[in-house]
Design a protein with these regions (language model features):
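Well-ordered alpha-helical segments within folded domains of soluble proteins
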Residues: 59-66, 112-119, 164-168, 226
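Short acidic alpha-helix initiation/capping motifs at coil-to-helix transition points
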Residues: 58-60, 109-113, 345-350
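Alpha-helix C-terminal capping segments
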Residues: 66-72, 119-127, 278
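Hydrophobic alpha-helical hairpins/lids featuring a short glycine-rich hinge
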Residues: 45-100
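Glycine-rich, mobile lid/loop segments that gate access to catalytic sites or pores
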Residues: 77, 85-163, 181-188
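Long alpha-helical scaffolds in large eukaryotic adaptor/regulatory proteins
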Residues: 14, 18, 72-75, 93, ...
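Terminal-appendage/accessory-domain detector
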Residues: 1-54, 155-165, 172-392
Length: 392
């Protein structure tokens, strides 16, 4: 059931992004419906996230798994099993990366190919040797620079799609006999030597790592979510009054200290804007990060200050915490809604699905259709038909 919930969440993200400029590019450039979907899962910044690995598995794993399942004409259970293995590989590799890597590279991209390979390899029933070849080749071609954060471009969406499609392709090549370097992570001139200063040990616990993945209820960068959650809690208690101060961990400030956002992407990566959204009585949905919202919230945004608190930096990335201080009132959260410690309820995921279906310009019945297929479907045929209807 856990994998089905993440499939549902990915479908919600795709639905919400179907009217975006990236979707227009996808329809023009890509005839394949799953390739179009692969470009959309990350667009709204509402895709699932693993905190310690600092990456978003969903937009990579589902296009790879579903494409492999379509090719093999297999059932939903086989696709779900492959997806769980894809989450496992992507997260396991991602958790070995260090702060140096994250400072320069986008882990959803750099670790994503491993997940795409593992998902497809499972569905293709590759043996250990062939799977190792494909994983090694994923390491040999990986990349994904953060430069796109500094320009108003669509590259981030392409990163996730590339990892998904590349993983599928490499698994297909390995099945045909294409060999690859099995020491591509730790070997001489391997990934770690090129991109990581201090690799961490790969830790695989007793439970599948998909259970440690967080859902994102709000349409902003995950680094802004703890501040949003604190603001919501203060607002519910009638204690959120501007001006406010936000204390959080260093990376949240590095990525999301943007007091003067200009573009929609800027706003999604602005703690100041995210907290102003809540102070204005809004819900932090996609509509709250548009150009219109940026202009409307300028005065409130100017009353939100941001600073680092070492107590949050010390426990990051295991926990993405924050504190919002409003006069004599304050709210501190070590974790945020959607994290395993503050798990997403079925109601929250259902509300997210309905909201994004509406935002994407679909009829409400499409939310019911997606819900039924994702949570109860036994074949991927209806899922492919759903995406065809949404993205044609």
């Amino acid at each position: 059931m856990r994998a089905r919930l993440h499939l549902l969440d990915w479908l919600a993200c795709v639905a919400g992004a179907r009217a975006t400029p990236v979707a227009a590019v996808a329809r023009t450039a890509e005839p394949d419906i799953l390739t179009r979907a692969a470009l959309l899962g990350n667009v709204l910044e509402m895709d699932d996230v693993h905190r310690a690995a600092l990456l978003h598995p969903g937009p990579v794993i589902w296009p790879s798994a579903l494409s492999a399942a379509r090719q093999e004409k297999c059932g939903m259970d086989t696709a779900l099993d492959g997806a769980v293995r894809g989450y496992e590989a992507m997260i396991a590799v991602g958790t070995t990366f260090d702060a140096h890597h994250y400072a320069h590279f986008h882990p959803t991209s750099t670790a994503g190919g491993f997940g795409g390979v593992a998902a497809a390899a499972s569905i293709f029933a590759l043996d250990t040797e062939a799977t190792g070849w494909a994983l090694g080749n994923a390491a040999s071609v990986t990349g994904g620079l953060w430069r796109m954060r500094h320009e108003d471009v669509m590259t981030k969406a392409m990163h996730a799609a590339r990892a998904a499609l590349e993983g599928l392709w490499l698994a297909r090549l390995a099945r045909a006999g294409l060999t690859g370097p099995v020491q591509a992570l730790e070997g001489e001139q391997g990934l770690y030597a090129a991109m990581v200063e201090h690799p961490k040990a790969m830790e695989l616990g007793p439970d599948w790592l998909i259970h440690a993945v967080s859902f994102k209820p709000w349409a902003a960068c995950r680094h802004a979510h703890a501040a949003i959650d604190c603001a919501i809690e203060l607002q519910a208690a009638g204690k959120l009054n501007l001006p406010v101060a936000v204390e959080t961990y260093a990376d949240a400030i590095r990525f999301c200290d943007r007091p003067h956002p200009v573009t929609e992407l800027d706003a999604k990566f602005s703690i100041q804007h995210a907290v102003a959204v809540i102070a204005d009585g809004r819900k932090a949905g996609p509509e709250d990060f548009t150009a219109q919202a940026i202009a409307a919230l300028a005065d409130k945004r100017a009353q939100v200050s941001v600073r680092e608190a070492e107590e949050f930096t010390r426990v990051y990335p295991a926990h993405f915490g924050a504190r919002v201080i409003s006069g004599t009132a304050e709210m501190t959260l070590a974790d945020t809604r959607g994290d395993p410690e503050r798990p997403a309820s079925p109601e929250m995921l259902g509300a997210k699905l309905r909201s994004l279906v509406q935002w994407g310009g679909l009829k409400p019945v499409e939310a019911d259709r997606a819900h039924e297929i994702a949570l109860h479907g036994t074949s991927i045929g209806p899922l492919l038909a759903l995406l065809e209807d949404w993205l044609a």
